[in-house]
């Protein structure tokens, strides 16, 4: 008999790392119902009692289970200390008025949870990150090759989960948004690696594709299942941009962010984030910031000097003002949605995303 934890990624509190990772992926993503688990080798489960004798099919199943645990291990490790789960909260908030059936909602949450976690594994490799949520990145534990394979496996597992929605349109949405996400990521990487500073408009278009991709995927799948015909995509695109600009700001200004990811990680990565782009374009005659990005430095004194340059051009103030304007725009859209159902959850997310202080 297989022991299946009932909880999902959504609603879990922070767990201690270095727990028994053999349980974590199923616990967080709730990939199967108990009935399905009886007939499938589920990564991250264990038998409650060992049979006194094992048939060839039992042994084959046990071997497959052991293999799957190896394949899932990097993702298991990442999921053993969940983040803020903004995407899960966003899905729940939109469902207050989209009102899709619970079984469909669970599938969409699993799909987005898998895709998001897999994308973090890949991002950390592409960005040469050291920390994720305050702990060593997965590829520092399992190696780059195994981590890439685990992430790719999760992408296709998410695709397989879509079949449970029973609609061909779901696959069209999935493919379209994954292509947009990777287009956005490709431009972000190109700008960094070629030391090409984009315009703010180019950056925001990239963000709409990249950061907004999983937001949009989730909401489009929900709209597909909902009787509510209001188009939520413009609001979702706006939320994706707000989320990214806020993240860019926090990367260079937040002590908590520094604790979880390292101080000024975007500078070490050489990334053209929103405040960095504004600073460079505000003073094209000053090449210091561009040269610091080129070095991909880990020297904290140099990074703090870069932050002072960004501050001197008013770029952090510009970020705060941009976020205020975008948040006000999102609240105006919510007013139009108010007559269609409960929007308290979405208002709560906007409150959370507002910079404090």
UniProtKB/Swiss-Prot annotation:
A Pfam family it matches: polyprenyl_synt
Keyword Oxidoreductase: no
Region span, Disordered: 36-60
Record's keyword annotation contains Metal-binding: yes
Bias type Polar residues, positions: 50-59
Cofactor note: Binds 3 Mg(2+) ions per subunit.
Catalytic activity from the UniProt record: isopentenyl diphosphate + dimethylallyl diphosphate = (2E)-geranyl diphosphate + diphosphate; isopentenyl diphosphate + (2E)-geranyl diphosphate = (2E,6E)-farnesyl diphosphate + diphosphate; isopentenyl diphosphate + (2E,6E)-farnesyl diphosphate = (2E,6E,10E)-geranylgeranyl diphosphate + diphosphate
Residues noted as binding isopentenyl diphosphate in the record, renumbered to the chain: 84, 87, 116, 133
Listed pathway(s): Secondary metabolite biosynthesis; terpenoid biosynthesis
Amino acids binding Mg(2+) 1: 123, 127
Record-listed E.C. numbers: 2.5.1.-, 2.5.1.1, 2.5.1.29, 2.5.1.10
SUPFAM superfamilies with a match to the protein in the record: Terpenoid synthases
Amino acids binding dimethylallyl diphosphate: 132, 210-211, 244, 251, 261, 271
Described function: Geranylgeranyl pyrophosphate synthase; part of the gene cluster that mediates the biosynthesis of meroterpenoids called sartorypyrones. Within the pathway, spyE provides the spyF cosubstrate geranylgeranyl pyrophosphate (GGPP) for the prenylation of triacetic acid lactone (TAL). The biosynthesis of sartorypyrones begins with the production of triacetic acid lactone (TAL) by the NR-PKS spyA using one molecule of acetyl-CoA and two molecules of malonyl-CoA.
Protein's name in the database: Geranylgeranyl pyrophosphate synthase spyE
């Amino acid at each position: 008999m297989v022991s299946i934890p009932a909880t999902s990624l959504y609603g879990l509190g922070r767990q201690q790392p270095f727990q028994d990772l053999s349980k974590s992926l199923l616990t967080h993503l709730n990939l199967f119902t108990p009935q399905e688990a009886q007939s499938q080798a589920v990564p991250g489960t264990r038998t409650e009692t060992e049979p006194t004798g094992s048939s060839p099919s039992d042994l084959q199943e046990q071997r497959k289970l052991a293999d799957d645990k190896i394949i899932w291990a990097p993702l298991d490790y990442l999921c053993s200390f969940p983040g803020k789960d903004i995407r899960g909260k966003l899905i729940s908030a939109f469902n207050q008025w989209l009102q899709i059936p619970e079984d469909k909602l669970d599938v969409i949450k699993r799909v987005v949870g898998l895709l998001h976690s897999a994308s973090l594994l890949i991002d950390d490799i592409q960005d040469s990150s050291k920390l994720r949520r305050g702990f060593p990145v997965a590829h520092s534990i399992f190696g780059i090759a195994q981590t890439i394979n685990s992430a790719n496996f999760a992408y296709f597992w998410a695709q397989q989960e879509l079949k449970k929605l029973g609609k061909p349109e779901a696959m069209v949405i999935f493919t379209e948004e994954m292509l947009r996400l990777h287009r956005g990521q490709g431009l972000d990487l190109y700008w960094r690696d070629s030391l090409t500073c984009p315009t703010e408009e180019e950056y925001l278009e990239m963000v709409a594709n990249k950061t907004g991709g999983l937001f949009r995927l989730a909401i489009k799948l929900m709209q597909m299942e909902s009787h509510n015909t209001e188009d939520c995509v413009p609001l979702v695109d706006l939320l994706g941009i707000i989320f990214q600009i806020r993240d860019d700001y926090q990367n260079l200004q937040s002590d908590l962010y520094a604790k979880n990811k390292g101080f000024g990680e975007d500078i070490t990565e050489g990334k053209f984030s929103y405040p960095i782009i504004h600073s460079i374009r505000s003073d094209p005659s000053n090449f210091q910031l561009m040269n610091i990005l080129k070095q991909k430095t880990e020297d904290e004194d140099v990074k703090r000097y870069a932050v002072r340059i960004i501050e001197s051009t008013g770029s952090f103030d510009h970020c705060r003002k941009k976020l205020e304007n975008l948040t006000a725009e999102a609240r105006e859209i919510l007013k139009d949605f108010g007559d269609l159902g409960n929007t308290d959850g979405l208002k709560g997310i906007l409150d959370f995303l507002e910079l404090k202080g």
